C-alpha cells in the first residue's frame, strides 16, 4: 500500500470510528456490531504502526490506553473550578431564590435544573476543535493532568464538530452496572472492592496506566462551558445545546423552570426517579439561566451566587448487626456477610450486607452486636458504612475469620496480592454446589425449574456432584425430593434434556472458567465453533482474538489442561450434549424470513449475552429498524437489566416487551 493510500485509509477509519463512538457513547444509538467496530479499530492500529508519520494525538486508537505515566503533572485552571453552595431542604431553596431576586432587583429570573452526577469533576481543553488537555478539579485552582486517561473515555470527543477553542467542564462517572461488574471481578480475584461508583470512577481516572482506565467503562456528562473563543453565549441552556452540537454528551434530563415552585417540583420528581438511573446522582444543581444575570450576581471566594446544589438526604439507616455468616463461592473465595435486623433502605427491606473480606472487618472494627450504619452502594448493594461506637455496651463480640473452610474444613489460603481468603480444595462441596447453580443459570444452560433450592436438594441427596451428573437424573430420583410431583418431575427431566441442544457459548459460560463471562464465552464460541477446537487452542491463539487478554487466555488454557475437565467433556459427549456454536453470524442473517422484518424495535438496559450494538446490527440484518425512543410506532421493546424509563413508556403505548432470553430465542430460530 502506498503512503498516499495509507494516509487516506487512516483518515477514513478515524472518521468512521469517531462516528461509531459518538453514536454509541453519546447518542446511545449504536449503528454497528462490536465485531465490526473492533475490525476497523484493529485495521487503524495496524496502519498507524506501519505509518508512524501519520500518527495523531486525536486518533480513536489512543482510547485503548497509552504509555504508563510516572506522575500526574499539575495544571493551573484558567478560571477557578468553584464549588457550589448547598441546599438541604425546601427552605434553603426558597432562601436561594430570595437572594437571587434581591441581587437583580426582582427582575424575572429563569432557572435551569440539572442532575448532580456523583463522579469526578474534570475540565477539558480544546484548541481549534482538538482535545489537547484534561485535568481534575483538584483544589479548584490547581488540578492534575489526566489527559491520557480521559482519552480512553469514549463519550469524550477527541475532535469536535467545529474548529473551536474552548474549555468544557463535566463529570466523569462509572455506570452502576459497570460498578457491580468491576466489584464482582475484584472479589473473584481476591482484590479490594470499591465502596461506591464515585470512588471507582476516581480510582480509575487516577491510574498511572491508561490501559487500566480504558477497561473500566467510564463515561462523562459535560455540564458547562468555561471559556470559548469567538462565540457569544446568552444562557446556560444555550451553552448546553452548543456543547451537544459539538459532539459532547450532555445530560438529557435538564429542565428550565420559571418559578422556584417548578424547581422544587423538579427536585421532588428526581428524588423519586433516582433509583432507576444507571448512574449515581447525589442531588440537583440549580442555576440562573441568563448569563448576563449570572455576571451581575457574581461570585464569592468559594462559590457562584447564581447557582446552588440541592443535596439529597443520605440513603443511610441504622440497624443492629446480629451475626456474621460465611459463604464459599464457586471460585473458593470465602466472603463474610453481615446478618442484620431487618431495615428499609432505598425502598427495599435489607437483612444482609456484604462485608467483602477480613481486612474490611478489622479496618472498621465491626463486632457482632454493634449498631451499624447501612446504605446501598450505588443504590444497589447493601453495605455496612461504619459502626456507631457510642452505642456500644461492652457486650459486643469481636469477630475472627476462620483458618479453615466452613464447608470442607480445608485450610484457607491468601494467594499472592489477594485480600480474600480462599479455599483451594477442588472437591469442596460448597464450591461444587455454587458451580452447579451457575451451570444451570439463565445465561448458562438455562434449565427451567432447576434453581438454587432444587440444586441444593439434589446435592444433599447425593444425586449430583458434577455438571454431567445432571444428565443422568431420572424422574424417579426427582420424585424422592420435597415438593416434586409427577408433573413437575416430568417437566424438569424434559428441561434438562432440552438443554443438551444449547449453543456452545452457553455451555462454555456454564463451566465457570475463571475470568470468562457470558460475552467472552460467546466470542470464543463464534471464533472456534466447536469445543474440540477451543480445547486445542494455544495461549497465543487465544490472545490474538480481539478483547481477549493474557489473564483470560492463561485461565482458559489452564482449565482445559486438566484430566478431570477432559473427562467431563467426554461425559457430555456420551450424554449427547451439543458442543458446537449454533448462533447465526451477522453475515448469515441476510434474506432470512424473520419476526423482525418491518418491525421497529427499541433496546434498553444491559444485555448480558450480546452487546446492544451487536443486537442492533442483527435486528437490522433481519429487516428490522432500531430506534432510541419508545413511541406509538414502536413494535417491540427488548429490555435488559436496569431498563429504566423506557419500560414505563412501553406500558404507556401498549408496546410488547421481551426480556433478553425471549429475544435470543427468536434471534436463533
Swiss-Prot record:
Keywords: DNA damage, DNA repair, DNA replication, Ligase, Magnesium, Manganese, Metal-binding, NAD, Zinc. GO terms for cellular component: cytosol. The active site is at residue 116. It catalyses: NAD(+) + (deoxyribonucleotide)n-3'-hydroxyl + 5'-phospho-(deoxyribonucleotide)m = (deoxyribonucleotide)n+m + AMP + beta-nicotinamide D-nucleotide. The keyword Manganese applies. Zn(2+) binds at residues 405, 408, 423, 428. CDD domains: BRCT_DNA_ligase_like, LIGANc. Residues 591-669 form the BRCT domain. One of its GO terms (molecular function) is metal ion binding. NAD(+) binds at residues 34-38, 83-84, 114, 137, 171, 287, 311. Belongs to the NAD-dependent DNA ligase family. LigA subfamily. This is DNA ligase. It comes from Bacillus cereus (strain ATCC 10987 / NRS 248).
Amino acid at each position: 500500500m502506498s503512503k498516499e493510500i495509507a494516509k487516506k485509509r487512516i483518515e477514513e477509519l478515524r472518521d468512521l470510528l469517531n462516528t461509531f463512538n459518538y453514536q454509541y457513547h453519546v447518542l446511545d444509538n449504536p449503528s454497528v456490531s462490536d465485531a465490526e467496530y473492533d475490525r476497523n479499530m484493529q485495521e487503524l492500529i495496524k496502519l498507524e504502526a506501519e505509518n508512524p508519520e501519520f500518527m495523531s494525538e486525536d486518533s480513536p486508537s489512543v482510547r485503548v490506553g497509552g504509555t504508563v505515566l510516572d506522575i500526574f503533572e499539575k495544571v493551573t485552571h484558567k478560571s477557578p473550578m468553584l464549588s457550589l453552595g448547598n441546599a438541604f431542604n425546601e427552605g434553603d431553596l426558597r432562601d436561594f431564590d430570595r437572594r437571587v431576586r434581591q441581587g437583580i432587583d426582582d427582575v424575572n429570573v429563569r432557572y435551569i435544573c440539572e442532575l448532580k452526577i456523583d463522579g469526578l469533576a474534570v475540565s477539558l481543553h480544546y484548541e481549534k476543535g482538538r482535545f489537547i488537555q484534561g485535568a481534575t478539579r483538584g483544589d479548584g485552582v490547581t488540578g492534575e493532568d489526566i489527559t491520557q486517561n480521559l482519552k480512553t473515555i469514549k463519550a469524550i470527543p477527541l475532535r469536535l464538530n467545529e474548529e473551536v477553542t474552548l474549555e468544557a467542564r463535566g463529570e466523569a462517572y462509572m455506570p452502576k452496572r459497570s460498578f457491580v461488574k468491576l466489584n464482582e471481578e475484584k472479589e473473584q480475584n481476591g482484590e479490594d472492592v470499591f465502596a461506591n461508583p464515585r470512588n471507582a470512577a476516581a480510582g480509575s481516572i487516577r491510574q498511572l496506566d491508561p490501559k487500566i482506565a480504558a477497561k473500566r467503562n467510564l463515561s462523562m456528562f459535560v455540564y458547562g462551558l468555561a471559556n470559548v473563543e469567538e462565540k457569544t453565549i446568552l444562557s446556560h441552556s444555550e451553552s448546553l445545546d452548543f456543547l451537544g452540537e459539538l459532539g459532547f454528551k450532555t445530560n438529557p434530563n435538564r429542565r428550565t423552570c420559571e418559578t422556584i415552585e417548578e424547581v422544587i417540583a423538579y427536585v421532588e420528581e428526581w428524588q423519586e426517579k433516582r433509583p432507576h438511573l444507571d448512574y449515581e446522582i447525589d442531588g440537583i444543581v440549580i442555576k440562573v439561566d441568563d448569563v448576563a444575570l449570572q455576571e451581575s450576581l457574581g461570585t464569592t471566594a468559594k462559590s457562584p451566587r447564581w447557582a446552588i446544589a440541592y443535596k439529597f438526604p443520605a440513603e443511610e439507616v441504622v440497624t443492629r448487626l446480629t451475626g456474621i455468616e460465611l459463604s464459599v463461592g464457586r471460585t473458593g473465595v470465602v466472603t463474610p456477610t453481615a446478618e442484620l435486623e431487618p431495615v428499609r433502605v432505598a425502598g427495599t427491606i435489607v437483612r444482609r450486607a456484604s462485608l467483602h473480606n477480613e481486612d474490611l472487618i478489622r479496618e472498621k472494627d465491626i463486632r457482632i452486636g454493634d449498631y451499624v450504619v447501612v446504605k446501598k452502594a450505588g443504590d444497589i448493594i447493601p453495605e455496612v458504612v461504619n459502626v456507631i461506637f457510642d452505642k456500644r455496651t461492652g457486650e459486643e463480640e469481636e469477630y475472627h475469620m476462620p483458618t479453615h473452610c466452613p464447608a470442607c474444613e480445608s485450610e484457607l489460603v491468601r494467594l499472592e496480592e489477594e485480600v480474600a481468603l480462599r479455599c483451594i480444595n477442588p472437591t469442596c462441596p460448597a464450591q461444587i454446589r455454587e458451580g452447579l447453580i451457575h451451570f444451570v443459570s439463565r445465561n448458562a444452560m438455562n434449565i427451567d425449574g432447576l434453581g438454587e433450592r432444587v440444586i441444593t436438594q439434589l446435592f444433599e441427596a447425593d444425586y449430583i456432584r458434577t455438571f454431567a451428573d445432571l444428565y443422568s437424573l431420572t424422574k424417579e430420583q426427582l420424585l424422592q425430593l420435597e415438593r416434586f410431583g409427577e408433573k413437575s418431575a416430568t417437566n424438569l427431566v424434559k428441561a434438562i434434556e432440552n438443554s443438551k441442544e444449547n449453543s456452545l457459548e452457553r455451555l462454555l459460560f456454564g463451566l465457570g472458567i475463571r475470568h470468562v463471562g457470558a460475552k467472552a464465552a460467546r466470542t470464543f464460541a463464534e471464533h472456534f465453533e466447536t469445543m474440540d477446537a477451543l480445547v486445542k487452542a494455544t495461549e497465543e491463539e487465544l490472545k490474538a482474538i480481539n478483547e481477549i487478554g493474557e489473564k483470560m487466555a492463561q485461565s482458559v488454557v489452564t482449565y482445559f489442561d486438566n484430566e478431570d475437565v477432559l473427562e467431563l467433556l467426554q461425559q457430555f459427549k456420551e450424554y449427547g450434549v451439543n458442543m458446537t456454536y449454533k448462533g447465526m453470524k451477522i453475515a448469515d442473517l441476510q434474506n432470512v424470513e424473520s419476526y423482525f422484518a418491518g418491525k421497529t424495535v427499541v433496546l434498553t438496559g444491559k444485555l448480558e449475552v450480546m452487546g446492544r450494538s451487536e443486537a442492533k446490527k442483527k435486528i437490522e440484518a433481519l429487516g428490522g429498524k432500531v430506534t432510541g425512543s419508545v413511541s406509538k410506532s414502536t413494535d417491540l421493546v427488548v429490555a435488559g437489566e436496569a431498563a429504566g424509563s423506557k419500560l414505563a413508556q412501553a406500558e404507556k403505548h401498549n408496546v410488547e416487551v421481551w426480556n433478553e432470553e425471549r429475544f435470543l430465542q427468536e434471534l436463533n430460530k
